[in-house]
């Protein structure tokens, strides 16, 4: 059973780990006792930041990579690129993650560029976002520009690419380790290539680098007969625990994991299966504990527009997708904040996301948040919480599927690992 000892930030919310560790474990025990087969490719630097498991906080802080949560002071970040963004082919896994009104768009433009003028405006917005981050004292890194329209073929499928816009989807930083997620969309199979120059540099400078087992993405990974004719069908299926991805092999996107020190919260989604969560659980054990949480509407592609932990014991919980375990957080003393209804216009294209990108914010520290300049309601909410808002307009960038949290991957945050284990 978990016992709490907070190293920093007080004890607010820390007890939630005890509750979730004891309550959620009950529903997952049967699953984790099965014998899963997984592989991993982990690299160890010639001069690693951590020579053993008992490395000091000082040693870890000297690494180019160090981040334990979503709110410690941000020092370095990767920001994605919209350049050459390509519409993914309209395959079954894409259909399961997009809204019905956009299906004709994918059927018509799959394998082609997203609207050029829209991407141009998104590029300008993200450049401004980078400038603002630099002004706030954050080091900004960018992935490579790649031609995503090139068709590729594996023994199991063929596809074109998509983009390198959302580093949060593919990279998860846990302490001094960068984990490359395997992904679940065929159009994103080679997305890691855009980030390899950066990752290799971090590795040479001492960071740990792990690549999760790459799925074949064979037909068996997907329910080819997933019965979705409308969004309502999809919501009902997901609520029953039926997703387009099967348990044929591990798959997950990094954006389905939310970090809070030694405890990491994950959801089973259309792109993250239980095998993928189990791989992560085994890989991070015993130093970190992965907890599965679930929601009334489990269909959204990633967790960070549903459940966003923005401080120690402080969480944004989407009112349209309430967390089934939210009372456990409340009983533990967490402050649960319900964000206001988003203000994004109905006629603004959101090809692979919902309006709730308004809560997909990036914390620069516990008292500063990067938020969309158009979302005045949520700005007021943050101000009432005593959090200063840094306003940037990324409406066109939203159309490509992400808010500030999605468009970034924090590489370094100045802080220490909180201990939650006995």
UniProtKB/Swiss-Prot annotation:
Main location class: mitochondrion
Residues annotated as the enzyme's active site: 253, 302, 406 (amidino-cysteine intermediate)
CDD domains on file: amidinotransferase_AGAT-like (cd21136)
Gene Ontology CC terms, in alphabetical order: mitochondrial inner membrane
Assembly information from the UniProt record: Homodimer.
Family, similarity comment: Belongs to the amidinotransferase family.
Listed name of the protein: Glycine amidinotransferase, mitochondrial
Species, as recorded: Xenopus tropicalis (Western clawed frog)
